[in-house]
Amino acid sequence: MTLREMLTAEKWDYVTIQQASPKSFKIETYRPYAQNLVDYIRRHAPQAEVVFHQTWAWREDHTRMGMDQKPRGFMYRELTKAYHTIAREVGIKRIIPVGDAFQLAAESPEWHFERDPDFDYENPKYPELPREKNSLNGGFRWMSRPGKAKETQPGPGAAQPDDGSDKVFYNDGSHANGAGSYLAACVWYEFFFHDDVRKITQNPAWLGDRAISLRAIAHQVASEGIKPAAWPEEIR
């Protein structure tokens, strides 16, 4: 299905757009493409409000693009400035503040992430993993080494190697984990339906009472306009 087919399939109330996460903090990557996309949407779905989805900053220890070497809060500040600047340029009036929610959570005592001090990250031993209680991102896991599975695929009935020789220790510090996805979902729900997510009384079994604090954070950014401490001064 093409974009045009999707835009004309129904009379949409909203169409949301976002920048790809690895480019989200580079404002030059939005131009002229954001304007072109918004113009296209408005041409084929003129009744819909175009809304920006503010993506989130990667976890502070994510090594991709050298992000772990940047000052704390760098990615959040830059992507926030980019979304708000481009929104003004293309005439988008509202931004879903998911990135604000992630940052506000990261600044809170309950969800501030610190690496496991007892884990040897330089010499990990398969299948051990660090404790990552407060992470909102995927975090560390063992993955099949690229190309290794095909090269060493055992025959029928053969045992799979269990010594980790076919695995690589990988940190997914960009994608949301279950807690991060729950937080984002709460922000989206309250943003669009104007219904206080703090009224929800049922918690996901795997998250338990910690869901309460995530709902509170979602309400703060979606309805109360609370900004993280790292919010860029340029757009205050």
Predicted features and spans:
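Alpha-helical cap/lid subdomain in secreted, periplasmic
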Residues: 3-178, 199
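Generic hydrophobic/packing signal
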Residues: 18, 92, 187, 191, ...
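Charged/polar positions on well-ordered alpha helices
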Residues: 89, 183-186, 220
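Short, hydrophobic/amphipathic alpha-helical patches that form generic packing surfaces
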Residues: 179-194
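C-terminal accessory extensions appended to soluble enzyme cores
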Residues: 190-236
